[in-house]
Design a protein with these regions (language model features):
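Core of compact, soluble alpha-helical bundle domains
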Residues: 1-153
């Protein structure tokens, strides 16, 4: 387990006893945002809070093994697809989640854990964009060479 995973798991341990309050705050932030997807009601969100915690914990525990996280995360991303999530919704979800962490953890949201969550959420955004919308931030070598050629003309 690397330092990033350790920081994330420590934060999850702090949040776990009061995860229903965390998910209620997260739902509230999503409701206030300009998210386009059909989000669940507060009651439905609360009912799914244990599942959300288990999914988060499993992903964090295996972050150092992307090959084992990818299929699991892809499976759970289908919920977002069924909910009509747009590409911009992915960033809104990440931002709301990060803000909720910041408020809920308070002084326990150290610089180390902030960086770890930012990195994990960037991974989530990139992976979700690729799986749900076939958008990637990786440019193939051939594409890059063609771009350079067209710039020379």
């Amino acid at each position: 387990m690397n330092q990033q995973q350790s920081a994330l798991l420590n934060n999850l341990t702090i949040i776990k006893p009061n995860f229903h309050a965390f998910t209620a705050k997260f739902h509230s932030k999503l409701a206030q945002s300009s998210i386009e997807m059909n989000s669940p009601t507060a009651l439905q969100f609360n009912e799914k809070s244990f599942t959300l915690f288990c999914v988060l914990e499993r992903i964090v525990k295996h972050l150092d093994k992307p090959a084992s996280v990818a299929p699991f995360l892809a499976h759970h991303l289908m919920y977002l697809k069924k909910s009509g999530a747009s590409h911009s919704d992915i960033a809104l979800l990440s931002n709301a989640f990060y803000e909720t962490l910041e408020e809920h953890l308070g002084k326990h949201f150290t610089t180390e854990s902030q960086l770890a969550w930012k990195k994990a959420l960037r991974y989530f955004e990139s992976f979700a964009s690729n799986v749900l919308f076939n958008v990637t931030n990786v440019v193939s070598l051939q594409q890059r060479m063609q771009q350079k050629q067209s710039n020379k003309i």
